[in-house]
Amino acid sequence: MEINYELYLITDRRFLKGRQLKKVVEDAILGGVTIVQVREKDVSTKEFYNVAKEVKEVTDYYRVPIIINDRLDIAQAIDANGVHLGQKDMHLNIAREILGKDKIIGISVGNVKEALEAQNNGADYLGIGTIFPTGSKKDVDAIIGIDGLSKIKDSISIPSVAIGGINKTNFKDVLKTGIEGISVISAILDEDDIKLAANNLLINK
């Protein structure tokens, strides 16, 4: 599957406002989302599995890749396209042994050293951040800004997406770095019109 990282949605059910996750994801895809990561913290394995399976029904229908945050077991159970791992999650080499060469493995990085290490270890793509202050993620170690993003982007050759505080007012500045895509949560999920919110984040709409 050819991966288009242009508009990368990360799910967060705290923003649903009573809406169904499946419907929200579908509207986001119809608005232009090209890849979806299911991210669930502090839930049981059973609940995570059920949520991921539900989202996969939508992504499969629209032929959009689905990535699972952190949990290799969930990724395997639903046959997701891959996983996204943080710096404190399972080592990439071990994840690759478990998932095989055909699955996508993305790694979160915040500096050039982490980026080069992930690339050298065989990451398929990188999530670079945090770019701007954000309310979605509380344990932000360092805001790297556009300059930090550019330095990391210039040091690597694999695809990457920027994450952290990206919205319709600043995403064009982020894309000027040459990055393959932007990763968002609240910029889409916290809006009333999900489809329009996604569409507003496309450079060539």
Curated annotation (Swiss-Prot):
One of its GO terms (cellular component) is cytoplasm. 4-amino-2-methyl-5-(diphosphooxymethyl)pyrimidine binds at residues 37-41, 69, 108, 137. GO terms for molecular function: magnesium ion binding; thiamine-phosphate diphosphorylase activity. 2-[(2R,5Z)-2-carboxy-4-methylthiazol-5(2H)-ylidene]ethyl phosphate binds at residues 134-136, 165, 185-186. Mg(2+) binds at residues 70, 89. Its cofactor is Mg(2+). Pathway: Cofactor biosynthesis; thiamine diphosphate biosynthesis; thiamine phosphate from 4-amino-2-methyl-5-diphosphomethylpyrimidine and 4-methyl-5-(2-phosphoethyl)-thiazole: step 1/1. InterPro entries: Aldolase_TIM, ThiamineP_synth_sf, ThiamineP_synth_TenI, TMP_synthase. It catalyses: 2-[(2R,5Z)-2-carboxy-4-methylthiazol-5(2H)-ylidene]ethyl phosphate + 4-amino-2-methyl-5-(diphosphooxymethyl)pyrimidine + 2 H(+) = thiamine phosphate + CO2 + diphosphate; 2-(2-carboxy-4-methylthiazol-5-yl)ethyl phosphate + 4-amino-2-methyl-5-(diphosphooxymethyl)pyrimidine + 2 H(+) = thiamine phosphate + CO2 + diphosphate; 4-methyl-5-(2-phosphooxyethyl)-thiazole + 4-amino-2-methyl-5-(diphosphooxymethyl)pyrimidine + H(+) = thiamine phosphate + diphosphate. The keyword Magnesium applies. Its EC number is 2.5.1.3. Keywords: Magnesium, Metal-binding, Thiamine biosynthesis, Transferase. HAMAP family: TMP_synthase. Condenses 4-methyl-5-(beta-hydroxyethyl)thiazole monophosphate (THZ-P) and 2-methyl-4-amino-5-hydroxymethyl pyrimidine pyrophosphate (HMP-PP) to form thiamine monophosphate (TMP). Belongs to the thiamine-phosphate synthase family. NCBIfam families: thiE. This is Thiamine-phosphate synthase. The gene is thiE.
